[in-house]
Amino acid sequence: DGGLMNNLPVEPLEPVCEDIIGVNVNPVTEAKGFSSFRNYADRVMHLALRANIQHNIQKCDIYIEPPGLMDYNLFKISAAKQIFDIGYAHTLNLVEQIKRDLF
């Protein structure tokens, strides 16, 4: 996790890894009405993060963006366990495909 400046940091891995698997848990949601400043700020952050990682997505041999994460916003730290569980379950479903793609 590269935080705000480089949220999908593949550069440290390129010289030492044969294959790179990137995972994004901050998908861009559809624009809906902004009922609060928090909703607006969340949308702006997601758009900024997407623009920030776009170049590095192309460098990933496997790119995973688990579905179902659009219901969570960046400011809901209390949902970290649920977000982890969604990503873990989705990735387990991809294990055979990843093996075929990489080996």
Whereabouts are the PLM-identified features?
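Patatin-like phospholipase
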Residues: 2-103
